[in-house]
Amino acid sequence: MNQTLLSSFGTPFERVENALAALREGRGVMVLDDEDRENEGDMIFPAETMTVEQMALTIRHGSGIVCLCITEDRRKQLDLPMMVENNTSAYGTGFTVTIEAAEGVTTGVSAADRITTVRAAIADGAKPSDLNRPGHVFPLRAQAGGVLTRGGHTEATIDLMTLAGFKPAGVLCELTNDDGTMARAPECIEFANKHNMALVTIEDLVAYRQAHERKAS
């Protein structure tokens, strides 16, 4: 990732710390991956605190595929089958079947309905019957080990939520341009600045976690 482009957001470690602070303050974070991977920016929010307004922003400026990143334990708790048995997608993204809250929603499409679905899925005592399938929220199962195992937005979301002190569950959506093309780093940076979001790269998060785990050992 071009560090000159990112310099206004601080050093790699500062970017991670600023992202954690933003999440704790109820703000969103823009997460970029490498140019040689998806080369995309995802808006992420804590599943516990994301507001209807933030969901509306995400739907308006994102791909429309609003994803809920969860752990394997949560997937099992909710009895969510993986979307396919044989995942042949380029990066092995861990989609499960889609979901809708069983109660408290209308069509499930609105920002408010999607927030209701997210909250139902992450509730402490959530059970399979709390969700209908299919729906308009796309759960993503993160790999154990986070970004140190798989350098994806799903794992980055779970790692950031955990480091920020939230449940390991977060909402993500890819940022798109007004013409429908995918937003790249310059557009993601502009969007983050405009909407008071922190910005961090998956590479930053990998280095941060490796450094902290070396200290711990």
Curated annotation (Swiss-Prot):
Any Gene Ontology CC annotation: plasma membrane
Pfam families: DHBP_synthase (PF00926)
Residues annotated as binding Mg(2+) 2: E38, H153
Cofactor: Mg(2+); Mn(2+)
Top-level EC class: lyase
Residues flagged as site, Essential for catalytic activity: H136, E174
SUPFAM superfamilies found in the cross-reference section: YrdC/RibB
Effect upon mutating E174S: Loss of activity
GO MF annotation list: 3,4-dihydroxy-2-butanone-4-phosphate synthase activity; identical protein binding; magnesium ion binding; manganese ion binding; protein homodimerization activity
Compartment list: Cell membrane
Outcome when changing R37E: Loss of activity
Domain of life (superkingdom): Bacteria
Binding positions for D-ribulose 5-phosphate per the UniProt entry: R37, E38, D42, R150, G151, G152, H153, T154
Signals that turn on the gene: Is expressed at all temperatures, but accumulation of transcripts decline with raising temperature. Thus, its expression is repressed by heat shock.
Assigned protein family: Belongs to the DHBP synthase family.
Job description of the protein: Catalyzes the conversion of D-ribulose 5-phosphate to formate and 3,4-dihydroxy-2-butanone 4-phosphate.
NCBIfam families, A to Z: ribB
Name of the protein: 3,4-dihydroxy-2-butanone 4-phosphate synthase
Lineage: Bacteria, Pseudomonadati, Pseudomonadota, Gammaproteobacteria, Enterobacterales
